[in-house]
Amino acid sequence: MASKYAVKLQTDFDNPKWIKRHKFMFDYLDINGNGQITLDEIVSKASDDICKNLGATPAQTQRHQDCVEAFFRGCGLEYGKETKFPEFLEGWKNLANADLAKWARNEPTLIREWGDAVFDIFDKDGSGTITLDEWKAYGRISGISPSEEDCEKTFQHCDLDNSGELDVDEMTRQHLGFWYTLDPEADGLYGNGVP
């Protein structure tokens, strides 16, 4: 699955900004606030909260859940296994290295497969792209971009071809850069919502 968009492939795992970004995500995923996360918590949020509230079909929800499970297992998470932040961070490093190696070889990445699944849910009109309104619905429901301003900033950041709509390739490129490598082209991806 080749991409027309280049991404910075060098990681910067010791950068305090990268660590802070992942600490934000860890805290966001720690639903019960006990300082540990499990795959159970993540799947519950993804399937029971987000997919349900976006009106996903059972098939879409299952596909999305399969991708969420694969992605976070790539970070070392499992059902029933409590993971603290240092272990979570190490897992992200492993996931980032594995996905970036796949990206460099034009192979499907876990983040792209998850993107394909979530796009199928967002894309209500079946156009193959999502609109700003479709993105705003996700941002509001997921809580990752809770304000209209943050949603608009994310959308603008990801609209690499300036078409006024987003395709999964644009979103994947920006998320790889944001979560994996601190690519300056992806900085500010979630507006003020995520460091």
Curated annotation (Swiss-Prot):
InterPro entries xref list: Centrin_CML-like (IPR050145), EF-hand-dom_pair (IPR011992), EF_Hand_1_Ca_BS (IPR018247), EF_hand_dom (IPR002048)
Coiled-coil residue spans: none
Binding site for Ca(2+) 2: 123, 125, 127, 129, 134
Alphabetic keyword roster: Calcium, Luminescence, Metal-binding, Photoprotein, Repeat
Function, in words: Ca(2+)-dependent bioluminescence photoprotein. Displays an emission peak at 495 nm (blue light). Trace amounts of calcium ion trigger the intramolecular oxidation of the chromophore, coelenterazine into coelenteramide and CO(2) with the concomitant emission of light.
Family (UniProt): Belongs to the aequorin family.
Protein's name according to its UniProt entry: Obelin
Organism: Obelia geniculata
